[in-house]
Each structure stands twice: as structure tokens, then as C-alpha cells.
Amino acid sequence: MLIRKAEVRRQTRETEIRVQLQVDGTGEYALDTGVPFLEHMLALTAKFSGFDLQIRARGDLDVDDHHTVEDVGICLGEALVKALGDKAGIGRFGHAIVPMDDALALVAVDLSGRGYLAFDVPMPSPQVGRFDTELVEEFLRALAYNGRFNLHVRLLAGANTHHIIEAVFKGLGVALGSAARINAQRGVPSTKGVIN
């Protein structure tokens, strides 16, 4: 079986990023972004998707975390597109409803070739530690649009902001892992015969 993996590099005046992704992995990760909370969330996504993920990012953190977080999302999305190739045999759809103590998040994906984000996750607090919680939506938007997939995220319950975000990123991992999984009985999962 072909190993589905990709590497993406991005360099701007604001960030320098390298992402290595192996879809058919074991959930191993090595993350160095300068944004500890983002690393914590990406570790959850890697573990629950089964993707192997290595990310090294340097950004203008003296300004804020925005550019680094968004550009990591861009690169991870691009890596997913490259790793999945023509998407032959994938499940295409994946979803999860994930509890984390008080929080309950629904995450659904369609690896359709079309980027879209529907995000209905009220954040009780504007920050978790030093991390601006509005960056969760920015990251997911960059990931979905550059990964060319539909992503729906909805909070069903929750009061603790850390728990809410953790449920979202665990759900993202479960949903992406399911959608990307190969079913040997299938060709390209589209009546059009292609996904792009």
C-alpha cells in the first residue's frame, strides 16, 4: 500500500513553518511552534486521528500568536491535501461527538475537495492561559479551506473553556481519522468519479 504522507514548508515575513504528515500513522507527534496551548491541542488531534505529525514553526510571537496559529493551519491543510492524493478508497465522511467533563462537542468533516467551516462554539473566556480563544476558529478556518474539506463544529454543552477546546480538537482527530481511513472496497467516493 502506498504510504500517504506529505511535507509542506511556508516562509513569509511573519512565519517560517514546516509540517510533515503521515496519514497512516500511529498518532505520534513532535510539535515545536512556540505556542504551547496549540501544541497541546495538535497533540490531541494527532493521537485521536492516528496521523503522525511533525510541526516546527517560528513566528512573530512578539506581536501575538495569530500569524503562527493561522499559518500552521494553512500548512497542515495543504499537507493533508498532498497526503490524500486522489482520495481513492477513503471513507470521505467522518464525525464525532466528544465529551470532556462538562463539555460536549460535535465535529463533522467531508473530505469533499471544497473548503468550508461552520463554527458554533461560544467561548466562555477570551483566553486559556496566554492563548486567545478566538484563534481556535482562525486555525480551523485555515485548516478547512487549505485542506479543501467541509468542517462543522458545534458545542452541545460546556462551561470550561479549556475543556470545550479540548473536546473540539479530540473530535477533529476522530472525524479526520475516520474520513481519511481507507476502505479497500471503494474507489473514489463521489458520483462524479473525482474529488477536487
Curated annotation (Swiss-Prot):
Its main location: cytoplasm. It is found in: Cytoplasm. GO terms for cellular component: cytoplasm. It catalyses: D-erythro-1-(imidazol-4-yl)glycerol 3-phosphate = 3-(imidazol-4-yl)-2-oxopropyl phosphate + H2O. Belongs to the imidazoleglycerol-phosphate dehydratase family. Transmembrane segments: none annotated. PROSITE patterns: IGP_DEHYDRATASE_1, IGP_DEHYDRATASE_2. CDD domains: IGPD. It comes from the Bacteria. The gene is hisB. Keywords: Amino-acid biosynthesis, Cytoplasm, Histidine biosynthesis, Lyase. The keyword Cytoplasm applies. Pathway: Amino-acid biosynthesis; L-histidine biosynthesis; L-histidine from 5-phospho-alpha-D-ribose 1-diphosphate: step 6/9. InterPro entries: IGPD_sf, ImidazoleglycerolP_deHydtase, ImidazoleglycerP_deHydtase_CS, Ribosomal_Su5_D2-typ_SF. The keyword Endoplasmic reticulum does not apply. Pfam families: IGPD (PF00475). This is Imidazoleglycerol-phosphate dehydratase. One of its GO terms (molecular function) is imidazoleglycerol-phosphate dehydratase activity. GO terms for biological process: L-histidine biosynthetic process. Its EC number is 4.2.1.19.
